[in-house]
């Protein structure tokens, strides 16, 4: 147990229960500025830094830490504007630096007293605008330079922004009132990654069938990420189409057909402007979709219930690490989202009995893209929970 003061003349301390010597050393090495940052968003409670937390520590939080989520789009937009190899800066930040921060970040269950919805809704709206801006500057750079290696790297950077500020944001906003401004921003974001059918399939298919054999987004144990991606993308599209068909919207009246044709028309417009512009757009959309399906894959991997069986907090993987939570709009508190889909992100909570991922979302990405490693790590986790 390590006791760190806040380096100010206040009678307040934060106790850091470290799961490893490395965690403790890192936190100490970061010095007073880091400790002040932690304290700024903390109340004097236990903050658990153990990657495999045995208990659930709580901490009262506000919306302010979620401003960290804007680092990625700002870095990406700035890098593409500067051009050259700077176009890759968003990718390096998100999948290079963030996994390191994520690995050492404390695991904390958030608590919030009375919540003002305005700032939280503004976060969602801002994420949507940042994604649109990142798309715009990528297409500008592609039109200026052509489909060069730096532009491809810029497309990968924007793809990560699309996976977070675009799709994760749309995931949250897609559960809001249909026709509201935030809901409309979500529709635009999904259109810009060529995945407009996501809200239909997610809300009407996935939430009903998750962790069962009927859900194409829930992977059984033993299936690798790349196999899952190949199988789930067409299956989810088909499921979304079927959802509307069962409501009488068949053939040319099916909304999925309409959005598909609109997306194809948009690609045609981009190609008319420049083939380089269209190719850059496709690069970002492809990576954004891959990241979405990686998240789906990870969130329910190996967790199974029978069709019709009541769902519980044991049917989704959870992670309480502050870096993943703060930069991914509380998405890692996934069991709470499935227990009540209408719960906004600021009301999501951790569950003591929920199975815990081996690390945060950024770290798990590198595990998942190497299927043998992922399967070995998750086999141990599933055995630990007797699943």
Which functions belong to the PLM regions below?
Residues 55-76, 178-256, 281, 287-387:
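Cytosolic/stromal cytosol-facing helical appendages immediately following the last transmembrane segment
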Residues 112-113, 118-230:
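Intramembrane catalytic core of multi-pass membrane enzymes that act on lipidic substrates
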Residues 104-116, 304:
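Membrane-helix interface/capping segments
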Residues 57-103, 118-143, 149-163, 252-296, ...:
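Alpha-helical bilayer-embedded segments of polytopic membrane proteins, i.e.
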Residues 35-36:
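Compositionally biased, intrinsically disordered low-complexity segments enriched in Pro/Arg/Gln/His
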Residues 7, 11-15, 50:
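Intrinsic-disorder-associated, low-complexity terminal segments enriched in Asp/Asn/His/Tyr and depleted
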């Amino acid at each position: 147990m390590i006791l760190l003061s806040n380096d100010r003349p206040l009678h307040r301390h934060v106790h850091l229960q470290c799961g490893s010597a490395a965690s403790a050393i890192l936190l100490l090495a970061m010095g007073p500025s880091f400790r002040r940052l932690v304290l700024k968003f903390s109340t004097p409670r236990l903050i658990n830094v153990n990657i495999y937390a045995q208990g659930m520590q709580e901490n009262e939080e506000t919306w302010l830490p979620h401003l960290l989520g804007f680092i990625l789009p700002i870095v990406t937009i700035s890098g593409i504007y500067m051009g050259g190899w700077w176009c890759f800066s968003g990718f390096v930040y998100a999948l290079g630096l963030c996994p390191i921060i994520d690995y050492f970040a404390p695991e904390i269950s958030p608590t919030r007293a009375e919540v003002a919805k305005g700032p939280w809704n503004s976060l969602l709206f801002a994420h949507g605008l940042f994604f649109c801006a990142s798309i715009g500057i990528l297409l500008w750079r592609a039109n200026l330079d052509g489909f060069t290696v730096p532009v491809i790297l810029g497309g990968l950077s924007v793809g990560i922004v699309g996976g977070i500020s675009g799709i994760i944001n749309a995931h949250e906003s897609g559960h809001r009132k249909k026709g509201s401004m935030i809901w409309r921003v979500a529709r635009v974001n999904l259109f810009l990654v060529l995945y407009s059918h996501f809200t239909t399939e997610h809300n009407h298919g996935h939430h009903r069938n998750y962790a069962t054999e009927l859900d194409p987004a829930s992977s059984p144990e033993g299936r690798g990420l790349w196999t899952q991606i190949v199988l789930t993308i067409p299956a989810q599209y088909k499921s979304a189409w079927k959802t509307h068909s069962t409501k009488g919207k068949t053939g040319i009246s099916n909304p999925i057909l309409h959005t598909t044709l609109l997306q194809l028309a948009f690609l045609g417009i981009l190609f008319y402007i420049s083939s380089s512009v269209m190719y850059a757009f496709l690069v970002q959309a492809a990576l954004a979709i891959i990241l979405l399906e990686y998240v789906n894959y990870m969130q329910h991997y190996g967790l199974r219930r029978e069709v019709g069986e009541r769902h519980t907090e044991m049917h989704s993987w959870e992670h309480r690490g502050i870096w993943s939570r703060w930069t991914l709009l509380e998405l890692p508190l996934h069991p709470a989202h499935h227990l009540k889909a209408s719960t906004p992100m600021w009301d999501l909570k951790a569950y003591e009995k929920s199975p815990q991922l081996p690390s945060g979302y950024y770290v798990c990405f590198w595990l998942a893209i190497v299927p043998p490693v992922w399967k070995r790590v998750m086999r141990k986790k599933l055995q630990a929970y007797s699943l």
